[in-house]
Amino acid sequence: MKKILKQAVVAVITWEAKLALRRYKPKIAAVVGSVGKTSTKDAIYTVISGHFFTRKSQKSFNNDIAIPLTILGLPNAWSNPFLWLKNMIEGLLLIALPHKYPEWLVLEIGADRPGDIEKISKWIRPDVVVITRFGDVPVHIEFFPSIEDLVNEKGSMARALKRGGTLILNHDDKRVMDFADSLLSSRITYGFSPGADVVAGHDRITYGMYDESDLEFPYGIEFRIDHAGNSIPISLQGAIGHQHIYPYAAAFAVGTALGINSVAISEALAAHIPPNGRMRLLPGVNDTLIIDDTYNSSPVAVQEGLKTLRDIVAPGRKIAILGDMMELGEYSKEEHQKMGEMASKVVRLLVTVGIRSRVTAAAALDAGLSDDAILQFD
């Protein structure tokens, strides 16, 4: 019964969302990929919301319920039937009566299973599609026949791009660029490689003192974005990691596609705060610093996190707490082994959590990390 009711609710709010798009005709920026969607979506919103009335997907809500709700400007009612009824009534009022509606929607669009994005792409026609990263082993691969099938699914939104629309592509990700070879749309590429249209680089970790500490710890990162002969400095505080630069570069590319001045883009990004759980810096007790990357665990995210930990110059021990990387299917054991081997070269103490992460702990031990430097919890 619950499943039937959920399907009915999704059908109603999707129908309302379609009518809302038809009535108000907003422009749409869709963000797809396996890594960095939420960070990229938020950075894009920061750039364009200062110039256009803009609405974005909340948090990491990116499925067949969340997307219509974002279009309608309604909250997720979760398991409250009265709030769902209220949402459906408000959706009808949005369609029936004139409202002030956003000029731009920035939608994060995810796919856990085959057909998820293809279904959405049949009724959403974006003006801009951003493809972030796939990596060597994308998350959710467990539910797809092959990596190519997953890439095609997540990339299907690009095929729904409006005539005259723009693709924003991660130039450093070979799977992204190979997929885009078959597409004829206008494009702007971004990345660290010199061949990109928007080139990020010259990045370094900044250091400072936190309250109640006499020691210097990482405070953020600084980097530059080069585009069309201009070199723009960007400073990020409160978070760290190479992976944060990609969302900023993608947002810069979107701003460029929309005709926003590069100085205005950089000023907006200077005030941007990355989402929680993505390499956020949290001062701890007893002269410690916590790097909070707890939102999700994937091969790309763990690799980038360990690289960042490796590059930090700071007193004291470096400790990594690694959990299971889910939904990797046949790649699970090998990827957990890789993380253990990598961690053994970076940390003085490794803590693993989860059954799959037993493999991580064992690989770190085999790679030379001492037994008393590894703690394993199921």
For each predicted feature, which ranges?
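Short, basic phosphate-binding NTP loop
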Residues: 1-32, 39-52, 64-66, 71-72
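Extended acidic/charged loop-beta regions that coordinate divalent cations
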Residues: 94-104, 109-139, 177-233, 275-276
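Short glycine-dipeptide loop
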Residues: 127, 163-167, 315-316
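Nucleotide phosphate-binding/pyrophosphate-handling subdomain across enzymes
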Residues: 217-219, 230-349
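Short acidic-hydrophobic, aromatic-tinged amphipathic segments that line or gate anion-handling sites
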Residues: 372-378
